[in-house]
Amino acid sequence: MKHPGLSIINILTVLTVLTSCSCNQDRQNNWGIPDKEQELPGSETAVPEEIAYDCTVTVDASSFVSEDYIGNGVQWDPYEVNDISDTDWQKLYNRLDFMKPQFIRMMHNIGEKTVNGALIKEAGLEHLMHLLDYCQSRGITVMFGDWGGSIADPEKGTINETLLRNIAEYLDFLINTKGYDCIKYYNLINEPNGYWSQTKGDYDLWSHAVKFFWEEARKLGLDKKIKMAAPDVAIWTAEETFWVSNTVRDFPEATGIYDIHTYPSKITVNSGQYTDIIKAYKDASAPGSKIVMGEIGFKYQEPEDAGYHAENLKRAANLAHASTEDSQMFVYDYMYGTDMADAVFQTINAGYSGCVAWMLDDAMHYKEPGKLKIWGFWNIFGDERYGAEHETVRPWFYAWSLLCRYIPKGTDFYTVNVSGTDGIKAIAGVHDGKRTIAVVNVSKEEKTVKITSDNLGNMDNVRKYIYGEGLFVTEGDCTMHPVATDMDFSLSKGEILKLPAESMILLTEL
């Protein structure tokens, strides 16, 4: 598969665009790339006021859809395959330092640390400490959890009390002995509503396990250090909100955040139907509480996306180490970055407080012997085992990085209204008085967008980023440059921007 990204061809493509743009006296775009001392001509943002626009993005700074946002981040689990070299660990850290994830979900299996009922605390600890040390040193909020293997027996309707005690003891070890107070939330049993889960969709069995575990955690004083993240269900429709409402009823003190997982189809998100689905779960959560997207990714299951589904299977079948059952092969395409942005924007505007992308690295999980789940931003064992091209950062890393590093923990999001055309979504937030606005165009056509606000005020010293194929330049292994800096915006008058097809623009004072 041809791999897009950091090639000289990509850079030359951008320079060609810049050259053609500099000749256009009407300044039809603003794709200039600044160097260390000055910006190249053509890096201005707004197109002339007289140019017609397709839609209006209106920001209401007097109204908020989500406050004190936890942040966006990634699923980062202890690696199941091979040992990682010091060089690769440093590469992982450097890439994450550019992304700046605010929120990480991290899962394990307590059964792998239990021998004849006894907890072996050091089992697998070396790998896990690499992850937790990083999160602790960067102040990242961690949602830790157990996949659920052997914790419950759905045939007998029983729970494994030994394993549940060991989970509480292991958490006590990590938090109180090892000092990992970055762990703020705990997930018990991944996606308990699913037929693939250890509880096979039995709410009563899951709640029995949670009650027993939480009592064991309380005995150790852990209730003062962590809260539950629940119910952690995977949903595709609005028909399973009872999992959230029952959690509100049964675990009002134990639950710190509500969480769900979504793997929507492209048409579901791009059409806006996704908002209606996820809003139902927000509405089912406790008033004043937070709810997060504990996993988010795309699966092309709707009839309208049959072409994407077929292409996904074809690509997986043509890659020797890819699982055809559980891979998202469009992570190699720029489109996946804009689709993920679309989903996140709708999630934020529906009142959620965080999103965790599935997943960081292909190398974390086998689906079957010799077959990996291809979902990540890269495969850190590419050079050693799978081919150097797979270790290279994939395009959607840059889109997701913008939505992590420029949406820091504690961001408040304003109400945003988009009118005039389909395919455009937007968010607007503020952190410590500094504003960020992002707009995504998921359509196959260029769109002209007017951004306006009666009460947001002017934006000063703005950096502008644009994500899309051929629209930005990277440096080194993973650094993305803004296309312009030190810009000013008068939103009371309105600013008009052009968004190429399948692109995202982010404007930030941060």
Predicted regions and their residues:
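Bacterial N-terminal signal peptides that target proteins for export
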Residues: M1-I9
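Bacterial N-terminal signal peptides
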Residues: N10-S20
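Non-catalytic accessory regions flanking glycosidase/transglycosidase catalytic cores in CAZymes
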Residues: C23-Y185, G194-Y195, K200-T237, R249-A254, ...
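Active-site neighborhood of divalent metal-dependent phosphoester/pyrophosphate hydrolases
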Residues: I189-E191
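Acidic/histidine-rich catalytic cores of soluble enzymes
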Residues: W196, Y258, P264
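Catalytic cores of carbohydrate-active enzymes
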Residues: M228-A230, F242, T255-H261
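Catalytic-core region of carbohydrate-active enzymes that cleave or remodel glycosidic bonds
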Residues: S265-G370, L403
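Active-site rim elements
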Residues: S327-M335, W378-E391
